[in-house]
């Protein structure tokens, strides 16, 4: 779905680095290195990025909207 503003577990704001993460991921960088560079250190916050679906630069939300 839409990327959350805050981590579900600890409540830290994570959405402010999402666009850079997405851009760098699309350029073929390693997700672990991107999160390290963006200083996303907590496991719960890293999980939010790792579990968010991006397929060919399309989010799950883009697929669901087609069926409204």
UniProtKB/Swiss-Prot annotation:
UniProt superkingdom: Archaea
Recorded GO CC terms: cytoplasm; DNA-directed RNA polymerase complex
GO MF annotation: an example: zinc ion binding
Annotated Zn(2+) binding sites: 7, 10, 44-45
Entry's transmembrane regions: none
Single biological process term from Gene Ontology: DNA-templated transcription
Catalysed reaction, written as an equation: RNA(n) + a ribonucleoside 5'-triphosphate = RNA(n+1) + diphosphate
The record's free-text note on cofactor binding: Binds 1 zinc ion.
EC category name: transferase
Localisation: Cytoplasm
Pfam families in the cross-refs: RNA_pol_N
EC number, as in UniProt: 2.7.7.6
Listed SUPFAM superfamilies: RNA polymerase subunit RPB10 (SSF46924)
Predominant location category: cytoplasm
Keyword annotations of the record: Cytoplasm, DNA-directed RNA polymerase, Metal-binding, Nucleotidyltransferase, Transcription, Transferase, Zinc
Cofactors (names): Zn(2+)
Biological role stated in the UniProt entry: DNA-dependent RNA polymerase (RNAP) catalyzes the transcription of DNA into RNA using the four ribonucleoside triphosphates as substrates.
Family from the record: Belongs to the archaeal Rpo10/eukaryotic RPB10 RNA polymerase subunit family.
UniProt-listed NCBIfam families: PRK04016.1
Subunit structure: Part of the RNA polymerase complex.
Entry-linked HAMAP family: RNApol_arch_Rpo10 (MF_00250)
The protein's name in its UniProt record: DNA-directed RNA polymerase subunit Rpo10
